[in-house]
Amino acid sequence: MLLLLVSVIVALALVAPAPETQEKRLQVAQAPNVVLVASDSFDGRLTFQPGSQVVKLPFINFMRARGTTFLNAYTNSPICCPSRAAMWSGLFTHLTESWNNFKGLDPNYTTWMDVMEKHGYQTQKFGKLDYSSGHHSISNRVEAWTRDVAFLLRQEGRPIINLIPDKNRRRVMDKDWQNTDKAIAWLRQVNSTKPFVLYLGLNLPHPYPSPSSGENFGSSTFHTSLYWLEKVAYDAIKIPKWLALSEMHPVDYYSSYTKNCTGKFTENEIKNIRAFYYAMCAETDAMLGEIILALHKLNLLQKTIVIYTSDHGEMAMEHRQFYKMSMYEASAHVPILMMGPGIKANLQVPSLVSLVDIYPTMLDIAGIPLPLNLSGYSLLPLSSNTSANDQAFRVHHPPWILSEFHGCNANASTYMLRTGQWKYIAYSDGTLVQPQLFDLSLDPDELTNIATEFPEITYSLDQQLRSVINYPKVSASVHRYNKEQFIMWKQSVAQNYSNYIAHLRWHQDWQKDPRKYENAIQRWLAIHSSPPTHSPLSLVHQWLTTHSSPIAVDNKKTFSSYT
């Protein structure tokens, strides 16, 4: 940079930058390197006690001891693409309209990595990104509309396990290991005289596809080797409590049914699914460890801030579900750990944070001024031991986090406000579906909905949620989007529509009576685009009592544009 400035001055070909611009570039040149490792479906509760006792995670424990662990970190949308869109944009889901796994950020959206590159950072990405639109299957483009149509179809295979009986088989998820190797190779050749930012996206511990369940039937196989399974403390695995099907919240019942989890499961099945999931987490930890070890061997560890996080968690049979797509802790709670120069060691931070905080944190690390329109806040003040920094965070960061979900496998747009001891979950327009309220200090398993017992608290939290997001308007907007997308898709496939629709993820149920389901879709398309006026609660009840086929709901949209 200095040579460039000298040549500019000597040649008089360009106007020299202002002194403050030169100062900022010099600050960036002296800034630390950053490595962000983001996995998929990692339950954040495994990064601290007591969850960390169930599986050996040596490199996460290494980061805990030498850095900061955020004890209450949450996804802003518990599904892959929208959550990653929040992380890469620093904005809530409804602000970018990243509604589902098909609809994310625009391809040319300016991410934090783009900003850091513009300010002089060397940048590189490997592995799973999944934050922009159009990268998922047709199913993900059109599946969300099923919540608005009067049928209830299983959209996933029943969760199963698959073991490689090899105590020496360490590399199970080949694609992730290959990307880890690529990241390490890049570190070996990077110019260490300039700061760099490296991103590694891992697929694990996301469940694997289940071809035995049929074409396009989701990913419901928990797959590992004996090498990793031996890292799990089997006796420490907790069998989650379930409500009876008749007692479940209607949205939870819909999710459990579409995820193919309403059948009978033995305790041994449940325990094995959870054990295999934890083993997949152990393999994830090992890849994080390879990056940390490479930084150490290259004498870069002391110059590099390492951040580990995940897009969302994994239900692993809690609340009779697997996958994510829920506001329960298993799905919504994510890991965020940081270590490196300037990061306080062995610090546990109880403040509520979320993935939108990654964007301002990355810029803050680089010394780059933060945009004023971000939904998130830098986590750097919380990683220090000085009370002044912590107080500064508390003054600016609101004492709540927002998460929202608009994708498939749930029959209502869902909004979660997490604040203090409370978790408040609202659905649809706030009237069609009853809300949920949990006191996490007394009910960490979230089994007792106390919304009707504490109406004043419920009302207060709902008003607070509405001050953050006009969720009835957002829900209506998503409802319109779902219908528009389905109509566009139906027109694009023309005469092949029936064949395509029969091979989406619900095809096994669909083929039992395709004419009935096609007629249900036609009735839905015939009505205008306003949200339905009937309650998913009544439809689920009708299905349970008559074994016919109902469900309904609506969806959402933006805060700034929809207030």
UniProtKB/Swiss-Prot annotation:
<feature type="signal peptide">
    <location>
        <begin position="1"/>
        <end position="17"/>
    </location>
</feature>
<dbReference type="Pfam" id="PF00884">
    <property type="entry name" value="Sulfatase"/>
</dbReference>
<dbReference type="GO" id="GO:0005576">
    <property type="term" value="C:extracellular region"/>
</dbReference>
<keyword id="KW-0325">Glycoprotein</keyword>
<keyword id="KW-0479">Metal-binding</keyword>
<dbReference type="GO" id="GO:0046872">
    <property type="term" value="F:metal ion binding"/>
</dbReference>
<feature type="binding site">
    <location>
        <position position="128"/>
    </location>
    <ligand>
        <name>substrate</name>
    </ligand>
</feature>
<dbReference type="GO" id="GO:0005764">
    <property type="term" value="C:lysosome"/>
</dbReference>
<feature type="binding site">
    <location>
        <position position="40"/>
    </location>
    <ligand>
        <name>Ca(2+)</name>
    </ligand>
</feature>
<feature type="glycosylation site" description="N-linked (GlcNAc...) asparagine">
    <location>
        <position position="260"/>
    </location>
</feature>
<keyword id="KW-0732">Signal</keyword>
<comment type="function">
    <text>Catalyzes the hydrolysis of pseudosubstrates such as p-nitrocatechol sulfate and p-nitrophenyl sulfate. Catalyzes the hydrolysis of the 2-sulfate groups of the 2-O-sulfo-D-glucuronate residues of chondroitin sulfate, heparin and heparitin sulfate. Acts selectively on 2-sulfoglucuronate and lacks activity against 2-sulfoiduronate.</text>
</comment>
<comment type="similarity">
    <text>Belongs to the sulfatase family.</text>
</comment>
<feature type="active site" description="Nucleophile">
    <location>
        <position position="80"/>
    </location>
</feature>
<feature type="glycosylation site" description="N-linked (GlcNAc...) asparagine">
    <location>
        <position position="108"/>
    </location>
</feature>
<feature type="binding site">
    <location>
        <position position="249"/>
    </location>
    <ligand>
        <name>substrate</name>
    </ligand>
</feature>
<keyword id="KW-0378">Hydrolase</keyword>
<feature type="binding site">
    <location>
        <position position="311"/>
    </location>
    <ligand>
        <name>Ca(2+)</name>
    </ligand>
</feature>
<dbReference type="InterPro" id="IPR047892">
    <property type="entry name" value="ARSK"/>
</dbReference>
<dbReference type="GO" id="GO:0004065">
    <property type="term" value="F:arylsulfatase activity"/>
</dbReference>
<feature type="glycosylation site" description="N-linked (GlcNAc...) asparagine">
    <location>
        <position position="411"/>
    </location>
</feature>
<protein>
    <recommendedName>
        <fullName>Arylsulfatase K</fullName>
        <ecNumber>3.1.6.1</ecNumber>
        <ecNumber>3.1.6.18</ecNumber>
    </recommendedName>
</protein>
<feature type="binding site">
    <location>
        <position position="312"/>
    </location>
    <ligand>
        <name>Ca(2+)</name>
    </ligand>
</feature>
<keyword id="KW-0106">Calcium</keyword>
<dbReference type="InterPro" id="IPR051849">
    <property type="entry name" value="GAG-degrading_sulfatase"/>
</dbReference>
<feature type="glycosylation site" description="N-linked (GlcNAc...) asparagine">
    <location>
        <position position="496"/>
    </location>
</feature>
<dbReference type="GO" id="GO:0015024">
    <property type="term" value="F:glucuronate-2-sulfatase activity"/>
</dbReference>
<feature type="binding site" description="via 3-oxoalanine">
    <location>
        <position position="80"/>
    </location>
    <ligand>
        <name>Ca(2+)</name>
    </ligand>
</feature>
<feature type="glycosylation site" description="N-linked (GlcNAc...) asparagine">
    <location>
        <position position="191"/>
    </location>
</feature>
<dbReference type="InterPro" id="IPR017850">
    <property type="entry name" value="Alkaline_phosphatase_core_sf"/>
</dbReference>
<keyword id="KW-0964">Secreted</keyword>
<dbReference type="InterPro" id="IPR000917">
    <property type="entry name" value="Sulfatase_N"/>
</dbReference>
<feature type="glycosylation site" description="N-linked (GlcNAc...) asparagine">
    <location>
        <position position="373"/>
    </location>
</feature>
<feature type="modified residue" description="3-oxoalanine (Cys)">
    <location>
        <position position="80"/>
    </location>
</feature>
<keyword id="KW-0458">Lysosome</keyword>
